[in-house]
Amino acid sequence: MWKGFVAGLVVANAFEWVAHKYILHGTHRAGKPRYSPVPDSMKSHWEHHREVRKTTFHDHGYVEGWSNWRTKNEIVSLAVVAGVFGTLFYPVSKGMTLSVLYSAGNYYYIHRRAHLEPDWAMRKIPWHYDHHMNSNQDANWCVTKPWFDYILGTRVISSLDLQEQNPLGIALPQVVSNKLTQWVNQVFPAKWVKAPEVIM
């Protein structure tokens, strides 16, 4: 069951990346508006972006809760995705099903808390803060953990204070974290808006 749960977490992070990039942001089309297979979700998400750019990362929709159409859309979308994938994974692995349900709830918790407590977001999920407040909003697609942003080369760091302790986005002993970061930077290097100066 644990192997299935861990595999489900990896699949959920990959889905988070794909859904954020292709459904919530939509794909560029020359001379036309962006395309999303779920246009209402894209509309909701771009309104979310406009809101947080105006309010220094805070989203009042989460304060309003269920009565806010964007919050309601996010909750319903997560429930549908969790229901569909949980049902599909159940015959294969109950651990994967459990991880899908956990991941949907965790995504909502992390995303909501980040936009209610911007200082917490800067410390705990700087990749998502970078996604909204960086000059390039078409990068840093992961919300809960930056795994697939590193794997797919879309982690763009705007400043040293917005660089996570390590690419797993998990608190680890400093020695382990440093070794992991060094290895990942060799294999899957993050991009920088402006490369940090090396102090000799």
Regions found by a protein language model. Give the residues of each.
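Hydrophobic alpha-helical transmembrane segments
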Residues: W2-V6, M96-L98
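Extended basic (Lys/Arg/His-rich) segments that typically form rRNA-contacting surfaces
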Residues: L9
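Membrane-embedded catalytic scaffold of the fatty acid hydroxylase/desaturase
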Residues: A12-P173, K179-P189
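Soluble, non-transmembrane catalytic domains of enzymes that act on hydrophobic metabolites at membranes
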Residues: K191-M200
